[in-house]
Amino acid sequence: MWDYSEKVKEHFYNPKNAGAVEGANAIGDVGSLSCGDALRLTLKVDPETDVILDAGFQTFGCGSAIASSSALTEMVKGLTLDEALKISNQDIADYLDGLPPEKMHCSVMGREALQAAVANYRGETIEDDHEEGALICKCFAVDEVMVRDTIRANKLSTVEDVTNYTKAGGGCSACHEAIERVLTEELAARGEVFVAAPIKAKKKVKVLAPEPAPAPVAEAPAAAPKLSNLQRIRRIETVLAAIRPTLQRDKGDVELIDVDGKNVYVKLTGACTGCQMASMTLGGIQQRLIEELGEFVKVIPVSAAAHAQMEV
């Protein structure tokens, strides 16, 4: 379980500036629902002074994503665009009295959304470096340019650091070799030598290997407490049942539609449909499920029309 500061909890349970800003003239979209994290930042900018008058956010992600987005909107209000662009992802984390290392990618996403919103306001196009050859992590659609920029901005030195800040390498691990290559080049540029960290899984194998034959056999079932699909579905339903009364008090509800691998499809109904807080509701559900199941899952909203098609 991650240790969150009181400020992170405050911005998660009582987020500031949730929802789209009315009359926004700057919009920044980053992330992807299919990858489990998405953020839209909307700004209202005074065209004569370039001062940010108001800011709002809509996000689909974990509690740290909500807290980081909430913090960012508070930080930028009253600043000029150029002043706001000086805010780093570390500044966002510091504003929240710190984030767990595994959640630093949420602050990076906030900074990217701010850059995208400013570019949108100025009519600029953010360089698209997501060419096929530049894509490093296919699981989370992270390109080489983002990996390099994040390594430089945060002085990262390990694959684990890169995963914490960008999510690259957090899926199938096939991109670890490419990440190590980039780390080798970037560390060399700042006069350092990259040393690959030992893989924790290998240490476990070394310890177990000398054990007598009966011990590993006895340990095998206990070492793999994987839930069956039926058990997973039951746990998911239990979590939704616990959340449902809160939604029903606001005349909303949530329904489990399907579970496909790590994808959990749900349908929001009643007042939850089209609610500005819907993305936050989904993010909260996803966080609860991850904690309950002990594995990463993506909560994906299904519209009424899509649900009807699934039933046919």
From Swiss-Prot:
NCBIfam families: NifU_proper. Its cofactor is Fe cation; [2Fe-2S] cluster. This is Nitrogen fixation protein NifU. The gene is nifU. The keyword Transferase does not apply. Fe cation binds at C35, C62, C106. InterPro entries: BFD-like_2Fe2S-bd_dom, BFD-like_2Fe2S-bd_dom_sf, FSCA_dom_sf, N_fixation_NifU, NIF_FeS_clus_asmbl_NifU, NIF_FeS_clus_asmbl_NifU_C, NIF_FeS_clus_asmbl_NifU_N. The lineage of its organism: Bacteria, Pseudomonadati, Pseudomonadota, Gammaproteobacteria, Pseudomonadales. The keyword Repeat does not apply. Involved in the formation or repair of [Fe-S] clusters present in iron-sulfur proteins.
